[in-house]
Amino acid sequence: MTHIRAIYTDGACEGNPGPGGWGVVIYFTDGSVHELGGHHPATTNNRMELQAAIEALKAWRQLAPGSAIALYTDSEYVLRGITEWIHHWKRRGWKTAAKKPVLNQDLWQELDALNDPLVQWHHVRGHRGDVGNERCDLIARRLSRGQPIALRTLPPPLG
């Protein structure tokens, strides 16, 4: 049985705000790779980073539910948000320490609903040669510009 070895996520935005894209690369223990990506015509970089993480967790739940995964992001915003800040935001009724509404609350709530103790969140430094991060970055940047990119996908299940 094959398992997910690692998931990488990234988001990009041409201008901030502006057109954006997100990318997800899923590596399996058998060497196969599954990639996802999307575009939004008017967004921010942080929203695309969050969307990438959301789509990664949706894919994990579909492809390998119940298995532990390592999820890598170059976004400190996403990493600290989901592992540290979110607990405080929820306790304060989705307000920051300054009593202001949490930005991107809709996406944070969606990510929180998908998150699971089986997900191990990791930071990877962007643009440092990490193959998974570089591929996600390329997908996100291409899609933010509306440029085509061939995504590697798994064949549909038999039956």
From Swiss-Prot:
> What's the subunit arrangement here?
Monomer.
UniProt lists the gene as rnhA
**Source organism of this protein record:** Thermosynechococcus vestitus (strain NIES-2133 / IAM M-273 / BP-1)
Give the reaction(s) catalysed.
Answer: Endonucleolytic cleavage to 5'-phosphomonoester
Do you know which InterPro entries this protein is assigned to?
RNase_H, RNaseH-like_sf, RNaseH_domain, RNaseH_sf, RNaseHI
Q: Is Hydrolase among this UniProt entry's keywords? A: yes
Q: Which residues form a coiled coil?
A: none
**EC number(s)?**
3.1.26.4
User: What keywords sit in the KW lines?
Assistant: Cytoplasm, Endonuclease, Hydrolase, Magnesium, Metal-binding, Nuclease
Its biological purpose is as follows: Endonuclease that specifically degrades the RNA of RNA-DNA hybrids.
Give the cofactor binding note: Binds 1 Mg(2+) ion per subunit. May bind a second metal ion at a regulatory site, or after substrate binding.
Subcellular location, in the record's words? Cytoplasm
Tell me the domain of life. Answer: Bacteria
What this protein is called in its record is Ribonuclease H
Protein residues bound to Mg(2+) 1:
10, 49, 74
